[in-house]
């Protein structure tokens, strides 16, 4: 009976490190796609949106003037496309 208890103890003691190693490698595999996507979609300084002196489409035009091709809506105070009915 003693041998049976010892063999069960050794088996369980051997399985615990195996489970720990498997869990650690699985968690690394789960982190790998996240790291890859974050490196692919990382914002580079060259591609950051530049601050303009004018407001673009559907932007507030209270303080800034609208860019060429847009007019400031008197009702909403947004830069919109000029149209005949907006006078």
Swiss-Prot record:
Q: Which residues form the propeptide?
A: 25-52
> Which PROSITE patterns does this entry report, sorted A to Z?
HWTX_1
Signal peptide stretch? 1-24
Task: Keywords in alphabetical order, please.
Answer: Disulfide bond, Ion channel impairing toxin, Knottin, Secreted, Signal, Toxin
One short Pfam name that applies is Toxin_12
Extract the GO molecular function terms from the UniProt entry. Answer: ion channel inhibitor activity; toxin activity
Q: In which tissues is it expressed?
A: Expressed by the venom gland.
- Where would you say this protein principally sits, based on its record? secreted
Record GO cellular component, one term: extracellular region
- Does the record's keyword annotation contain Disulfide bond? yes
Q: Which pairs of positions does the record mark as disulfide bonds?
A: 54-67, 61-72, 66-79
Its subcellular locations are: Secreted
Q: What is known of its domains?
A: The presence of a 'disulfide through disulfide knot' structurally defines this protein as a knottin.
Q: Give the family, as the similarity comment puts it.
A: Belongs to the neurotoxin 10 (Hwtx-1) family. 51 (Hntx-8) subfamily. Hntx-8 sub-subfamily.
Q: What does this protein do?
A: Ion channel inhibitor.
Q: What is this protein called?
A: U3-theraphotoxin-Hhn1a 13
Q: Which organism is it from?
A: Cyriopagopus hainanus
């Amino acid at each position: 009976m003693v041998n049976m208890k010892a063999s069960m103890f050794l088996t369980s003691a051997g399985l615990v490190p195996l489970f720990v190693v498997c869990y650690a490698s699985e968690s690394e595999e789960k982190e790998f796609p996240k790291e890859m996507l974050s490196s692919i979609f990382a914002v580079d300084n060259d591609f950051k949106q530049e601050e303009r002196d004018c407001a673009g489409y559907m932007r507030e035009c209270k303080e800034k003037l609208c860019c060429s091709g847009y007019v400031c809506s008197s009702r909403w105070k947004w830069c919109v496309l000029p149209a005949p009915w907006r006078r």
